[in-house]
């Protein structure tokens, strides 16, 4: 089985399908840092499959450059990543590149089984609308509909029309349901149906599939009308883990401190083992704490104490006047928030973490800092051997925008079962 990944980001959705044995025809992504992440991950997968994983860990240890890493795998491994913005002007060239890749793989029989991905969702994201409102005013339904980003689904449909996959997966935020008073979502489903697909959607919470985070996403699945396919059955995962199970084995850090290397201070928790977040021999990377102002650390400690006392989210207005820096407190009431370490799932990871970490404060009062890239990646269920290229800010953005691999794997498992039943 193979797939094309559109608007691929850092590859969270793709990771789930790769784990279930799907082959990547192409990853199409406009962000250059995310594309480097995709290429690095493709190198990891190739080297792992060919018993040469030591070369990858040399790269993580800084003993090999990225260029040397890429040179150690066949060109076609990294050429699956297409660093181009999908637009009417570029789409023909993207098709040509994908067609050449398909021709190079006779085992695919000239066919694409699956297309996955979700266009950027900033224009109708609830978070985006809240931020817009805080600065100015709410977007009108007309503005939401007219935002050019909201028509990227038509670019997605161009790929469906070109390659006629058996099924597709279209992912987005819950805000897509209500954008333009529901008109936008209705148009999307109609468009899919005109291409010969039956479609269904569900709101899925990643916390039901092993991710220690409440992260709701709309997952549309489509299948060719004449087929026997249907919306995949997803098996929920029951557990008694807490968020601390992905934090407590990592070295404790003060703000500005680096904890990378080979050693961790704690034992592997059952969660880390069950979901292969941390493997024996992994190299710890990207565990570097941001510098923090002393005032912010004092705020963090108050927030942590309030949570530890009675699970209260302390509001900005409740802080002593000496710690407040904003005259207008209404829009900053929830500016600071604790990662709920003793709960089975924390609040939703968002890309804003790239700007500051106030909304993701580590629950350990002795550290009193915002979380690191590696901690954010674990909250999203990325394994420790997943390296995010482009520096800390770029890494946080990629992680905050990603589909958690464990959610993606649950979807992939359900779809794979249908393909196997056909054989």
Protein language model features and the residues they cover:
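Class I S-adenosyl-L-methionine
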Residues: 105-108, 126-323
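C-terminal target-recognition/interaction regions appended to catalytic cores
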Residues: 271-423
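Short alpha-helical segments and helix-capping/turn motifs at coil-helix boundaries
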Residues: 94-105, 203-207, 331-335
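Core alpha/beta nucleotide-donor-binding catalytic domains of modification enzymes
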Residues: 2, 8-164, 174-178, 183
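Conserved small-residue
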Residues: 9, 38, 115-118, 156, ...
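Short, acidic Gly/Pro/Ser/Thr-rich loop/turn segments
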Residues: 122-126, 227-228, 255, 354-359, ...
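Short Gly/aromatic-enriched secondary-structure transition segments
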Residues: 41-42, 52, 236-237, 364-367
């Amino acid at each position: 089985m193979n797939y094309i990944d559109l608007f691929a980001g850092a590859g969270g959705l793709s990771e789930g399908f790769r784990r279930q044995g799907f082959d990547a025809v192409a990853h199409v992504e406009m962000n250059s840092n995310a594309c480097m992440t995709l290429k690095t991950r493709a190198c990891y997968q190739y080297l792992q499959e060919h018993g040469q994983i030591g070369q990858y860990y040399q790269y993580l240890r800084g003993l090999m450059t990225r260029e040397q890493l890429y040179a150690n795998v066949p060109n076609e491994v990294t050429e699956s990543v297409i660093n181009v913005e999908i637009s009417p002007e570029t789409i023909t060239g993207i098709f040509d590149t994908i067609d050449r890749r398909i021709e190079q793989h006779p085992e695919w029989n000239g066919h694409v089984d699956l297309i996955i991905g979700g266009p950027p969702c900033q224009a109708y994201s609830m978070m985006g609308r809240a931020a817009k409102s805080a600065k100015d005013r709410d977007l009108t339904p007309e503005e939401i509909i007219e935002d050019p980003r909201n028509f990227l689904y038509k670019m997605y449909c161009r790929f469906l029309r070109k390659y006629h996959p058996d099924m597709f997966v279209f992912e987005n935020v819950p805000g897509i349901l209500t954008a333009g008073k529901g008109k936008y979502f209705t148009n999307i489903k109609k468009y899919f149906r005109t291409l010969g697909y039956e479609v269904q959607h569900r709101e899925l919470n990643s916390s039901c599939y092993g991710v220690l985070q409440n992260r709701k996403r709309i997952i549309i699945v489509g299948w060719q009308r004449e087929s026997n396919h249907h919306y995949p059955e997803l098996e929920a995962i029951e557990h008694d883990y807490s968020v601390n199970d992905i934090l407590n084995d990592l070295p404790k850090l003060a703000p500005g401190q680096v904890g990378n290397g080979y050693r961790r201070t704690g034992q592997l928790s059952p969660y880390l083992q069950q979901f292969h977040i941390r493997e024996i021999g992994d190299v710890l990377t990207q565990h570097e704490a941001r510098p923090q102002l002393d005032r912010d650390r004092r705020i963090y400690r108050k927030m942590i104490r309030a949570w530890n006392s009675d699970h209260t989210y302390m509001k900005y207005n409740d802080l002593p006047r000496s710690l407040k820096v904003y005259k207008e407190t209404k829009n900053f009431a929830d500016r600071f928030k604790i990662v709920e370490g003793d709960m089975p799932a924390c609040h939703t990871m968002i890309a804003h973490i790239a700007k500051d970490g106030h909304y993701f404060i580590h629950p350990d009062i002795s550290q009193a800092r915002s979380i690191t890239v590696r901690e954010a990646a674990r909250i999203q269920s990325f394994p420790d051997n997943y390296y995010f290229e482009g520096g800390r800010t770029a890494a946080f953005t990629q992680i905050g925008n990603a589909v958690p691999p464990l959610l993606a794997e649950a979807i992939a498992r359900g779809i794979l079962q249908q393909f196997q039943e056909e054989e």
